[in-house]
Amino acid sequence: MRYLTAGESHGPSLTAIIEGIPAGLTLHPADIDHELQRRQGGYGRGARMSIETDRVQISSGVRHGKTTGAPITLTVINKDHQKWLDVMAVGDIEETLKLKRRVKHPRPGHADLVGGIKYHFNDLRDALERSSARETTMRVAVGAVAKRILAELGIDMLHHILIFGGITITIPSKLSFRELQERALHSELSIVNPKQEEEIKTYIDKIKKEGDTIGGIIETIVQGVPAGLGSYVQWDKKLDAKLAQAVLSINAFKGVEFGAGFDMGFQKGSQVMDEITWTPTQGYGRQTNHLGGFEGGMTTGQPLVVKGVMKPIPTLYKPLMSVDIDSHEPYKATVERSDPTALPAAGVIMENVVATVLAKEILETFSSTTMSELQKAFSDYRAYVKQF
């Protein structure tokens, strides 16, 4: 399985082409639209999300609600493009129109300046448009297809926010996977403690009035993955490493950890290793899950626990100092449309990116020309692991 995305933030549309999806997977536009709508939600989103109503168009690879095994083409129209027809025109335009929305004051924390240097851009909009988080629309769309595969194999997942700006979410003890999932899904903030909703919303409103932004830490949990996905035989086959690369590729993500993560640097080995158990009904298990479901780059059969840290959005309505790329004089950075926080949306993106990596690993590990073939191979492997 592989995919490419294309499109600019204010261009006509966004596109993804996915190759390697088995034939016979039930797939409807509504499956993808559901995830796209989740990405657009969450408290603290800005004006752009009130303009766009993301809906996918499937133009290949699906017929009568079933995948055919051919490449799948997904497209999402950018409604806002109608206001940018001159600025984002494909053909040449008058010089005065080119200057209309030219970006020459790069924003600290964005790809503007370095992208302009690398690709020799006189107008930093050429970097800004593609590096925008709008691209993640299509990674969510691809992830929605991946989640359909995982669902057919009995794999489920959730995400929730652990830290919202400077506020740590208190996680009620002994919540099941399903309870965590339901609480996060029904929260505008993707948190599992409803008692903290108003406190955080008030904080977001304050940050917005100040023209500032906040980041935080997101946790994704995956249930139902058997032991043995990934490999220790080469560095680039380790599944946790693949997940780390994918999570860090999400806009504004600056760190990733698994299970207890960086806290393990302060503990002894006897405190963090997950002792092995075995029962006739369940097979192998673990007393704990400090390692987040991974050993040696392979899944252990425990829930996968992946955490990502998102920096505050770098576009500020109270802009920081920058430099004019023409005169090299100090200037306030360019202001583009932005949100005080996009943590709930980033959680949806992270969840779908993780789903894509897992689906790809499964499709490369098991016979997968058709879904029925994949389901049988996966079921047989589960049975093997249980009796090992």
Curated annotation (Swiss-Prot):
FMN binds at residues 130-132, 251-252, 296, 311-315, 337. One of its GO terms (cellular component) is cytosol. GO terms for molecular function: chorismate synthase activity; FMN binding. NADP(+) binds at residues 39, 45. PROSITE patterns: CHORISMATE_SYNTHASE_1, CHORISMATE_SYNTHASE_2, CHORISMATE_SYNTHASE_3. Pfam families: Chorismate_synt. InterPro entries: Chorismate_synth (IPR000453), Chorismate_synth_AroC_sf (IPR035904), Chorismate_synthase_CS (IPR020541). Its cofactor is FMNH2. Keywords: Amino-acid biosynthesis, Aromatic amino acid biosynthesis, FAD, Flavoprotein, FMN, Lyase, NADP. Homotetramer. This reaction introduces a second double bond into the aromatic ring system. This is Chorismate synthase.
